[in-house]
Amino acid sequence: MLRIAVQSKGRLFDDTMNLLSEADIKVSASKRTLLVQSSNFPLEVLYLRDDDIPQSVASGVADIGVVGENEFVERGEDADIISRLGFSQCRLSLAIPKEIEYRGVNWFNGKKIATSYPNILRNYMQEKGVECEIHVITGSVEISPGIGLADGIFDIVSSGSTLVSNNLREVEIVMNSEALLIGNKNLSADKRATLEEMLFRFKAVKDAEDKKYVRMNVPKARLQEIINVLPGLKSPTIIPLADDEWCSVHTVLDQKRFWEIIGKLKEMGAQGILVTPIEKMIL
């Protein structure tokens, strides 16, 4: 049975459990149990702190794990990156009090920076040739400048609202981060087979994101024009109707261009346009 390490709470926990659910892998999300087994898939879920996940996977306590890229890089554990999952996106940034004039990263020479990510920060500053004092703290990094503990901070930024509420401004983006699926380097053949099945399901879910299934009635006289503006997966499905002068066209559209394309279709005479979301898409 495959064992996956998952963050025990927070946004990454929510996003991971949603992905498992959409892949029809049923798992209890009880906060009182650290190890639970799926009721319909050969998978155990081990709930851990996010900073413990890289080591648990590298050591073989867990076979695979979902972890923020920021934690994976910071810990430097020897595990494989299997897939980028595209959710729980954030960035690691340097921030300083907003009233301070900032002229570049050399401002941090001789300054004290508070962070929970000393390794990433140290490597970045060495690359930039900046000598600074790194003060490691594990929580509430953003209050450090306000209480005189540091001149600036290096921390996770999502919306930036926490920085604003603490009178700080972002001055350097050091790295972008998203959820990663990582794996132990020595998985057995059976576990790799289970992993491949899970990845197949994940891909079907991810491929369906921001896609719409569109059905419409179109005049046959303009059918080729309409086909030419459809950026479907391959060729759209054409179905004859009782009225010989009309046919039904089925296709898949990307949400990013949905309204642009729908407008063109209406101009070309498409009618009865029906739009439905797609749960999963197997290419």
Give names to the regions the model predicted.
Residues 1-43, 69-80, 85-91, 99-283:
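Small-molecule-sensing regulatory modules
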Residues 51-56, 61-78:
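Pocket-flanking alpha-helical
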Residues 37-55:
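Active-site-flanking structural segment that lines cofactor/substrate pockets
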